[in-house]
Structure formats: C-alpha cells, structure tokens
C-alpha cells in the first residue's frame, strides 16, 4: 500500500515536471529519522507529502521477502524430489522410503491444518471457551497417538503385502472386488473436493488478513504453487514440504500463544477475562467460558469424537502409513 502511494506521488510529480519543463526543477526526498516519516516530493509548483511509518514499511518488505523465499523453497523441494517420482509407486508413495520425521510431520500437518488457526481458534474457541482445549487433547491422543498405535504397523504391512498404493486399491486387493475399488475411488473423489476447498479457504483467508492480499488471488496462487511441487515431486515433495511447514506451524503456534497471554497479562488474567465474557446466543450462564466443561459438554464430546476418530478413515491420513520406510520408523514416528 505504501509503495503504491509512493508511485502515485512520483507519477504526479514527474507529470508536473514534464508540464513545466525540467529547468531548475528538482525532486527532494527528505526522510526524518523518527519512526514517523514524511516524504516530500517538490515538483516546483507543488509539494506532495506522504506520511509513512518506517516500521510498517520494513515489516511489509520483510514479510514479502520471507513469503517469496517460502514459495521458492516449496517449488525447489518439488523439483529436488523428482528423483523419487520416476514411477507410479515413487510418485504416489515416494518409493516407500519416507522416514519417521517426515511421516510424522506429514501426518500432523495434514491433521492440524487450517482447522487449528481458523476452526478451533475461531469457531470452537468462542463457542466453548477454554473447554475447547479438550478437542486438541482428544485429537492428539485419539486422532494421532492411538491411530499410529492401532493402524500404523498393520496398514504398512498389509499395504506392502498387497502391493497397494492407494486406499481404493487396498480395498480392491484386500476384498477382491473391483466394484468396491471403484466405489471407494468415487467417494474419495467427491468428498475430498469440499474438504480441499475448506483448506484453501482457510489458508487464503489467513494470507489475506496477514498480507492484505485479495482472497481470489490467494486461492489461485496457493493452488498453482501446490500443483507445481506436487506434480514435480509427488508424495516425497509433499512430505518434505509438510516437514518444513510443520516447523513453521509449531513456531507460529508457540509465538501466538505467548503473544496472546502476554497481551492479557498472563494465563490467569486471560482466564479471568474469559470468565467475564458472555454471548447470549450461546448461553446466559456467567463465567461459563472459563469452565473446563464449557456451556455444552455433550456437544463438545461429539465434536472431540468426530474430529478424532473421523480422521482414521481419511485417505490422505492413512496413506502416510503406506509410504513410511519400515516398522522401526513407525515406532519412532509414533513418539514424534
């Protein structure tokens, strides 16, 4: 925004210079040393002033550089992973060579994606208050830990024995039914469309708020970048990028929690402020949002079960067990 304004002012100044001639006309740009700066462009007949914030400019420039670097790394990882995508198995499963760290982070980032920052933090956080923490605990124990313990080793062994690379192929080989294979493919194709759309929606809204980028531009940009590195490197490209993004997410979550608690004067002060919050549309009970059982414990229980056990059947989650290197890696991945 600041750069756009500067270009607009420069354009007007040069037009004024052109109209009045260049003789004895100069452009002066004066920067103050304080945080509040004023840029003066003297075109001879008029002085244009634009007050800007030095920190704001530097922050936007730094964010832009980091964003471009992130995109470059994503695409670079895609082309780097091409060596693993020389055949169908390599493209879909990375040659079954993904280690425990890559697989664990790929599982985690697929599970705790936009829902953490948009769904849980926004909808569930306000609807249930502090009790929404149970959703995160349930997801971590039931949706992640228990899924790795129950499904990890069995899925890895059976998928390799049946030489299956996808869930529909696994069903077809396991039960000897082409109809089941086709049916599973159709179901996955249909219902993953709104699922994927919700992820792009959440991601684009976050980018839009953070960088003031148009929502449609974010959608197109994310889709194009994802398509490039997925088509170029297949599963291994997504696993490596998920690992990188997982580290960023962990750092971001810790930073957000620390910033929020610091702005509210600590955990107890934040909890006290939450106790004073009220929403007649949810409940009239005072202090209910600070309760660890929340305004609707039964409904919250269903949310925990749905979001924890429901992921056990998602193909993009189960496929992580298809691609992991060996049983030893599954044990390490479970801990990670």
Locate each region found by the language model.
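Lipid-exposed faces of alpha-helical membrane segments in multi-pass integral membrane proteins
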Residues: 62-76, 139-142, 146, 183-190, ...
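Membrane-water interface regions at transmembrane-helix termini and the short interhelical loops
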Residues: 126-128, 151-154, 205-210, 224-245, ...
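Membrane-interface helix-loop-helix modules in multi-pass membrane proteins
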Residues: 92-163, 298-310, 317-319, 323-336
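Membrane-interface "cap" regions at the ends of multi-pass membrane proteins
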Residues: 53-119, 230-233, 246
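Hydrophobic alpha-helical transmembrane segments
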Residues: 180, 286-307
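Short, Lys/Arg-enriched N-terminal segments with co-localized hydrophobic residues
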Residues: 30, 38-57
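Hydrophobic alpha-helical segments and their helix-loop junctions in multi-pass secondary transporters
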Residues: 77-84, 192, 196-200, 204, ...
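Helix-loop-helix module between adjacent transmembrane segments
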Residues: 135-230, 303-310
